[in-house]
């Protein structure tokens, strides 16, 4: 699986074994949905008071 791991959409990395999801975190209160964090995960992170997480399982989907 290949996931973006920076705020720039053309930079990505291959996820290590066992991390089968890509995630993208955006600020909940910010009108533009600019990603503040991206990467690989084994489980989808839980949303927090400030961040909304979206997970997916195909190459470069985040």
From Swiss-Prot:
Subcellular localization(s) per the UniProt record: Secreted; Target cell membrane
UniProt cross-references to SUPFAM superfamilies, sorted A to Z: Snake toxin-like (SSF57302)
Keywords: Cytolysis, Disulfide bond, Hemolysis, Membrane, Secreted, Target cell membrane, Target membrane, Toxin
Job description of the protein: Has low cytotoxic activity.
GO annotations of cellular component type: extracellular region; membrane; other organism cell membrane
Tissue expression pattern: Expressed by the venom gland.
PROSITE patterns: SNAKE_TOXIN (PS00272)
Highest taxon listed in the record's lineage: Eukaryota
Protein name (record): Cytotoxin-like basic protein
Signal peptide (from-to): none
InterPro entries to which the protein is assigned, alphabetical: Cytotoxin_Cobra, Snake_3FTx, Snake_toxin-like_sf, Snake_toxin_con_site, Toxin_cobra-type
